[in-house]
């Protein structure tokens, strides 16, 4: 395959992947979460296309564990975002399907909010089936690829959600290509959690919703950078 990280697999390899994928625990603890995935070509311009592999896998992981109308859905970075249903029966088929999306665009976070709210209102979705967290996953920085994300835009979105009895989802912007291990998690003025890097511990911390200063500190202390000191 031209992307490299999901090359042609044997029947046995596909079966093993399907079994491994199906056995993954639910780190979301039954909370709905929706991935907004950067599918542009730059995600593949790294060794082993790791950012793309991580982003697409997270999109699939969160989508499969959602309940209600957001089950098996993700959103692609776009100026006109849409809820995209993930198709395919096996892990390999579903990952292949996600790889067919490759729009080169910033994401319009205001339009993402409107998309989710409109879907919820139209389908009478209860609060517990609304995504608690939106994961915006990219290889770029927040300010470089997110539009309509001012403090006033967030305040307006929060008000619109409240008018329909909903809470605005928490936003986690995840730069999966960043090598910044000094500040794996920060927050900007909009209250968006900015996550940098891609490690199993960071994944566990982010999906648990535990973005406390203590957890952030432990992520830094236990990073490879300080391994010799703590040994």
Regions found by a protein language model. Give the residues of each.
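Acidic, glycine-rich A-domain
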Residues: 1-231
